Amino acid sequence: MTLPEIDSLSITLLMDNYTDRLLPSSLIAIRPPMMKNEQFLPPPPPVAEHGFSALIRVASNDSMAYQNKGESLNENIILFDCGTSENGVVSNAETLGINFNSINSVILSHGHFDHFTGLPSILKRIDKPHQINLPS
């Protein structure tokens, strides 16, 4: 199997069993700020609950797209797992300013409730046609 070369990869954790708003950002982890202009920001803290969900952005330089449309970056956005509650991942995505319509694919790692329960709420927020493929 040959994997294509990519130019950038970012992973935004939407649900991972844990949250700590007091941790500062670092070179490898950019966290939402708690304060702006010495004032606490009003959004609620992220929902912390059992389960997992991550938004994965993969960007690659696509020379064919560059020749045809003048664009040089092809980005795919994947939602990997959907959390354990109806609205936990939705709430965290909204807090982080994530638009569900930007998602190209949803991947469920396995059939445990803490990885798929949020899927119906997420699909309701995607305003474009989508296809669901289930293994036989």
Residue ranges and their predicted role:
Residues 9-12, 76-78, 105, 130-131:
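Structural motif
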Residues 51, 83, 117-118:
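Glycine-centered flexibility sites
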